[in-house]
Swiss-Prot record:
Its main location: membrane. SUPFAM superfamilies: NAD(P)-binding Rossmann-fold domains. It catalyses: 2 Fe(2+) + NADP(+) + H(+) = 2 Fe(3+) + NADPH; 2 Cu(+) + NADP(+) + H(+) = 2 Cu(2+) + NADPH. This is Metalloreductase STEAP2. It comes from Homo sapiens (Human). GO terms for cellular component: cytosol; early endosome; endosome; endosome membrane; Golgi membrane; plasma membrane; trans-Golgi network transport vesicle. The gene is STEAP2. Its EC number is 1.16.1.-. Gene3D superfamilies: NAD(P)-binding Rossmann-like Domain. Belongs to the STEAP family.
Length: 490
């Protein structure tokens, strides 16, 4: 695979791959690139190549019919003719059609074949499409790449995340050629090494929110539980005790009581994972021991949990702003005014309630502002503009501040009602009491980690210090035998 002398007299790689003795592909206007196939991806790829100054030759089973869908400057011909005109060929056909090129394998000797195909599902075949293509044409230089880019992105030009293309090949020089070609097409190539990485590259476009599944399930489960909890307390209890029908509260009021609890619980889960990781390292006295799989997965999903927390907080704000618009709220307001007049009360001002509501709303706005900052800095383009210290300060320090202010928001909302018997319906605590449990645990755990006796030990562990007991029993050696390459930084 590494040799290209089979094309005739020994030549350098650039002389063999490119026509007319061109060195490299820096002058794209003199390079001919072949595309096997005439589908949507082949059409978009051809347009992209032409815009970047390449000459394109299309190999098709029916060139007369296919030529109607390509620009007139494109040479549309049969497979055999196309393969003889270029040394860099995009194989833009499905896996089941690879064998159609079998009779032309003598024309593919020493040429670069770029496999851009994808499968219908993850791990559909025992080997990747690129490895299968390499087994069919062992004398060709197979490169996997451009399969993560859609035809739409190719035609309109790469933008943002669609600029990245993953490339792998067993031939280093062929891989470098395709990497340079990707740069000429204004993509950002990412070298993933040998062709064994092709299976992972082919699975990338087929994954559907892999890291989001767990957090979404957790969020839905929490929302369902707290919704039913509020429904039983605020709707079923009045009906069972006083035959009072409060079912009208379900669409807005019950939902709005559920949203903030889920939001603050998800935010607590974001930072609880880090506390458990720190406790794990303190317990074993080392940072070289891998976390349990469940904790490792939890740590990887913190961004998704935080964004879901921000989503529930934003929806909570929208619902809260709509509360005064409800017809039921207007009726309640009129009833209160009538009762006040009937009781001959001239002034219903309550200083304590005024201060409570003012502080409650103020803390809510501050927590939402900090959550917005956390959400914005999680955007890749924004986080890439920050150095590590800036990013960790926002996501860690300000994140804990946001959690603390959110906890104050809930505390002031509950005020003294946690100690009043009438709010314990069916002998269950109020919603805000449940909402405070997990944030309080996280804040208390963070305070414990700030203690000098613990923080100093944790810093030593992060710098590589280990307990001798772990080295003797777990590692079976001394510190010089520990390889830094084995460390997994979460």
């Amino acid at each position: 695979m590494e040799s290209i002398s089979m094309m005739g007299s020994p030549k350098s790689l650039s002389e063999t791959f490119l026509p007319n003795g061109i060195n490299g592909i820096k002058d794209a206007r003199k390079v001919t690139v072949g595309v096997i196939g005439s589908g949507d991806f082949a059409k978009s790829l051809t347009i992209r190549l032409i815009r970047c100054g390449y000459h394109v030759v299309i190999g098709s089973r029916n060139p007369k019919f296919a030529s109607e869908f390509f620009p007139h400057v494109v040479d549309v011909t049969h497979h055999e003719d196309a393969l003889t005109k270029t040394n860099i060929i995009f194989v833009a056909i499905h896996r089941e059609h690879y064998t159609s090129l079998w009779d032309l394998r003598h024309l593919l000797v020493g040429k670069i074949l770029i496999d851009v195909s994808n499968n219908m599902r993850i791990n559909q075949y025992p080997e990747s499409n690129a490895e299968y293509l390499a087994s069919l044409f062992p004398d060709s230089l197979i490169v996997k790449g451009f399969n993560v880019v859609s035809a739409w992105a190719l035609q309109l030009g790469p933008k943002d995340a669609s600029r990245q293309v993953y490339i792998c090949s067993n031939n280093i020089q062929a891989r470098q050629q395709v990497i340079e070609l990707a740069r000429q097409l204004n993509f950002i190539p990412i070298d993933l090494g040998s062709l064994s990485s092709a299976r992972e590259i082919e699975n990338l476009p087929l994954r559907l929110f892999t890291l989001w599944r767990g957090p979404v399930v957790v969020a839905i489960s929490l929302a369902t539980f707290f919704f039913l909890y509020s429904f039983v307390r605020d709707v079923i209890h009045p009906y069972a005790r006083n035959q009072q029908s409060d079912f009208y509260k379900i669409p807005i009021e019950i939902v709005n009581k559920t949203l903030p609890i889920v939001a603050i619980t998800l935010l607590s889960l974001v930072y609880l994972a880090g506390l458990l990781a720190a406790a794990y390292q303190l317990y074993y006295g080392t940072k070289y021991r891998r976390f349990p799989p469940w904790l490792e997965t939890w740590l990887q999903c913190r961004k998704q949990l935080g964004l879901l927390s921000f989503f529930f907080a934003m929806v909570h704000v929208a619902y809260s702003l709509c509360l005064p618009m409800r017809r039921s709220e207007r009726y309640l307001f009129l009833n209160m005014a009538y009762q006040q007049v009937h009781a001959n009360i001239e002034n219903s001002w309550n200083e304590e309630e005024v201060w409570r509501i003012e502080m409650y709303i103020s803390f809510g706005i501050m927590s939402l502002g900090l959550l917005s900052l956390l959400a914005v800095t999680s955007i890749p383009s924004v986080s890439n503009a920050l150095n590590w210290r800036e990013f960790s300060f926002i996501q860690s320090t300000l994140g804990y501040v946001a959690l603390l202010i959110s906890t104050f928001h809930v505390l002031i909302y509950g005020w003294k009602r946690a100690f009043e018997e009438e709010y314990y319906r069916f002998y269950t605590p109020p919603n805000f009491v449940l909402a405070l449990v997990l944030p309080s645990i996280v804040i208390l755990g963070k305070i414990i980690l700030f203690l000098p006796c613990i923080s100093r030990k944790l810093k030593r562990i992060k710098k590589g210090w280990e307990k001798s007991q772990f080295l003797e029993e777990g590692m079976g050696g001394t510190i010089p035998h520990v390889s830094p390459e084995r460390v997994t930084v979460m």
